[in-house]
C-alpha cells in the first residue's frame, strides 16, 4: 500500500492542511485537506471517501469535492455513519449554505451514502476494511486496511486516552495516530486528544497487549506547536525504542 498524507495538521494555512489521507491514489480517508491537496484529475480518479467522524477539520473539503464532481456529473460513494451524514446535511451541506450532494442532482446524487459503523467490514478499493470504535469527544471510527499481501494500516483518526485497547484489536504494520498538543497542554485529554506523553502511555500499553511496536506516523498536530511536539515525539521514540515520526504534509509512505 502507498499512503499519501494530504493533510496532517490541526490548522490550515498555505503550508498546513486539515486531516486527510490517500491510499493507493484511490481511497480518501477523511476530507479535511482533500481538494486543497489534489489536482482536479486526481479528484476525479477517487473511488471512494471514508469519513471517520463529523468534526469540521475532517469533513471540510466534502463541500468542494462534491461541487467539482457535480460539474463533471460524477458520483462517488461516501462511507460514513448515519450520524455523520445527518450532521453534514444539517450544517455544511445544508442548502442554505451550499448543496446537499447526498440529494443533488435528484436523478443521480453526487454522493452515494454507504453507511458504516464500528464492527463493519467491507472490501473497498482492493483492500479489506474494518471499522473500530475509538475514544474521542464524538463518535469516531478507526480504520484498518489490509492489502492482499497481508500488510496492514491502522488509521485511528482523532482519539484520546484509553485508545490502546482499540488499537490492539489490529496488528498493524503502520499505525497512523494523532498528537494534537504538547505535554504542556494536558487538557488535550479532556477533548479526546493525545499529547506526546499520553501517546507514550498508549504505545506502551499496546506493546504490553500485542508484544511489539508498529511503525508510528503522527498526524493532527496543531501547527503552532509543531516544533515542540516534534521534539517531544522524538523523545518518546528514543524512550520506547520505536520508529515514531511526525507525518510530513504531502509525504508518501510505503506500508
Per-region residue spans from a language model:
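Short amphipathic alpha-helix with an adjacent loop that forms part of the alpha/beta core around
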Residues: 38-43, 64, 122-125, 165-168, ...
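Divalent metal-coordination and catalytic microenvironments
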Residues: 3, 21, 29, 53, ...
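Active-site metal-binding motif and surrounding structural segment of the metallo-beta-lactamase
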Residues: 35-80, 173
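Acidic/polar short surface loop at catalytic or gating sites that assists cofactor/ion binding
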Residues: 75, 79-111
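Cap/insert and terminal regions of metallo-dependent hydrolase folds
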Residues: 160-251
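Catalytic core of the metallo-beta-lactamase
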Residues: 113-171
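Active-site neighborhood of phospho(di)ester-bond hydrolases with catalytic His/Asp-centered motifs
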Residues: 29-32, 47-57, 79-81, 154-159, ...
Amino acid at each position: 500500500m502507498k499512503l499519501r498524507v494530504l493533510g496532517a495538521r490541526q490548522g490550515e494555512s498555505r503550508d498546513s492542511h486539515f486531516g486527510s489521507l490517500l491510499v493507493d491514489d484511490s481511497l480518501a480517508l477523511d476530507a479535511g485537506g482533500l481538494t486543497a491537496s489534489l489536482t482536479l484529475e486526481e479528484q476525479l480518479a477517487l473511488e471512494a471517501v471514508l469519513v471517520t467522524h463529523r468534526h469540521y477539520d475532517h469533513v471540510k473539503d466534502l463541500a468542494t469535492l462534491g461541487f467539482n464532481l457535480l460539474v463533471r456529473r460524477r458520483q462517488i460513494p461516501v462511507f460514513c455513519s448515519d450520524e455523520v451524514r445527518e450532521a453534514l446535511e444539517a450544517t455544511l451541506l445544508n442548502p442554505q449554505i451550499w448543496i446537499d450532494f447526498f440529494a443533488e442532482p435528484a436523478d443521480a446524487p453526487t454522493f452515494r451514502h454507504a453507511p458504516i459503523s464500528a464492527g463493519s467490514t467491507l472490501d473497498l478499493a482492493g483492500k479489506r476494511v474494518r471499522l473500530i470504535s475509538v475514544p474521542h469527544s464524538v463518535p469516531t471510527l478507526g480504520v484498518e486496511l489490509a492489502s492482499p499481501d497481508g500488510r496492514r494500516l491502522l488509521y485511528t483518526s482523532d482519539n484520546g486516552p484509553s485508545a490502546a485497547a482499540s488499537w490492539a484489536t489490529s496488528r498493524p504494520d503502520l499505525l497512523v495516530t494523532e498528537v494534537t498538543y504538547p505535554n504542556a497542554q494536558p487538557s488535550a485529554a479532556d477533548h479526546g486528544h493525545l499529547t506526546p506523553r499520553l501517546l507514550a502511555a498508549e504505545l506502551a500499553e499496546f506493546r504490553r497487549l500485542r508484544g511489539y511496536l508498529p511503525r508510528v506516523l503522527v498526524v493532527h498536530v496543531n501547527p503552532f506547536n509543531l516544533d515542540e511536539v516534534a521534539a517531544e515525539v522524538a523523545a518518546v521514540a528514543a524512550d520506547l525504542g520505536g520508529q515514531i515520526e511526525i507525518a510530513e504534509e504531502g509525504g508518501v509512505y510505503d506500508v
